[in-house]
Curated annotation (Swiss-Prot):
UniProt KW Zinc-finger keyword: no
UniProt xrefs under PANTHER family: NON-SPECIFIC LIPID-TRANSFER PROTEIN 2-RELATED (PTHR33076)
Hydrolase found in the keyword field: no
Protein name stated in the entry: Non-specific lipid-transfer protein
GO molecular function: lipid binding
One GO-annotated biological process of the protein: lipid transport
Organism of derivation: Daucus carota (Wild carrot)
């Protein structure tokens, strides 16, 4: 009976530890972030001062709302940084100013040089 009781207590302790440990996985993925930005590409490649499309701003707001945890924010930042490095003809000023033009405040600049490890 002592072995069963010890096993039960050990299982309960493990359950309590697992139940109180925050989930360390990001909800957002790079595929979601980069795929969602399709309506923004024309604006981000533009070399003239044009209005941001409403569909683009809706995406920016949606991504901002989806990035609730620090890990989500860092994931989104890393994906945006990766995209900024990969998109041919990207207007870096347009990318950096996109959140503000959509009325969104994010804790970093969309840039190929952003340090996403500092995002909280």
């Amino acid at each position: 009976m002592g072995v069963l009781r010890s096993s039960f207590v050990a299982m309960m302790v493990m359950y309590m530890v697992l139940a109180t440990t925050p989930n360390a996985e990001a909800v957002l993925t790079c595929g979601q972030v980069t795929g969602a930005l399709a309506p923004c590409l024309g604006y981000l490649r533009s070399q003239v001062n044009v209005p941001v499309p409403l569909t683009c701003c809706n995406v920016v707001r949606g991504l901002n709302n989806a990035a609730r945890t620090t890990l989500d924010k860092r994931t989104a930042c890393g994906c945006l940084k990766q995209t900024a490095n990969a998109v041919t003809g990207l207007n870096l000023n347009a990318a950096a100013g996109l959140p503000a033009r959509c009325g969104v405040n994010i804790p970093y600049k969309i840039s190929p040089t952003t340090d996403c490890n500092r995002v909280v």
